[in-house]
């Protein structure tokens, strides 16, 4: 029942020991199978146990408890989906520095594969006064073909290099941005 789930979760959180929850079938009847949802003696639960715990909290509309679980998933099972989900959750909590850190960890592990991820990371790096790394990230995305060579991304690369006082590295990006620009301001 809902009350038993709440009590089990509360007890597990209070003592930080493993708990077992009965598995229910589609009709809500117990199947006789038990699933451990807590952390093991070593301090790290199986990935599916964290996912089950996260699903329970989501189902109970206890979103406050989801973030620490995603943090553990990203730390113990460093997959792209956990790093990007963690970054998004930090963003929702207005924790931009942590948001940047999660995306940067995914980038360092070569997990990013979407333009929006490269641009988000480069913007956060620039915002936190690291224009050189911002330029390297956007340049890396451009070189890999993940980031499209369009005016706004080329202009961003140029501005990031310019801000890091690397004018020679900024020039080619300003030129490329000017070529694809519909306006003449970059010439």
Question: Which stretches of residues belong to each language-model region?
Answer:
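Alpha-solenoid helical repeat scaffolds
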Residues: 1-187
């Amino acid at each position: 029942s809902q009350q038993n789930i709440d009590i089990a979760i509360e007890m597990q959180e209070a003592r930080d020991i493993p708990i077992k929850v009965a598995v229910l079938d589609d009709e809500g009847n117990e199947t006789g199978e038990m699933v451990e949802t807590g952390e093991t003696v070593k301090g790290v639960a199986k990935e599916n146990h964290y996912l089950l715990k996260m699903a329970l909290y989501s189902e109970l509309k206890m979103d406050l408890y989801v973030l620490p679980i995603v943090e553990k998933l990203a730390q113990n099972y460093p997959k792209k989906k956990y790093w990007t989900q963690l970054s998004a959750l930090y963003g929702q909590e207005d924790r931009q520095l942590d948001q940047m850190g999660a995306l940067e960890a995914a980038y360092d592990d070569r997990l990013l594969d979407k333009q929006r991820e490269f641009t988000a990371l480069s913007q956060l790096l620039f915002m936190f006064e690291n224009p050189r790394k911002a330029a390297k990230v956007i340049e890396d995305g451009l070189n890999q073909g993940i980031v499209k060579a369009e005016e706004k991304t080329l202009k961003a690369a140029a501005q990031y290099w310019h801000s890091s006082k690397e004018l020679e590295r900024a020039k080619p990006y300003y030129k490329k941005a000017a070529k694809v620009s519909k306006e003449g301001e970059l010439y």
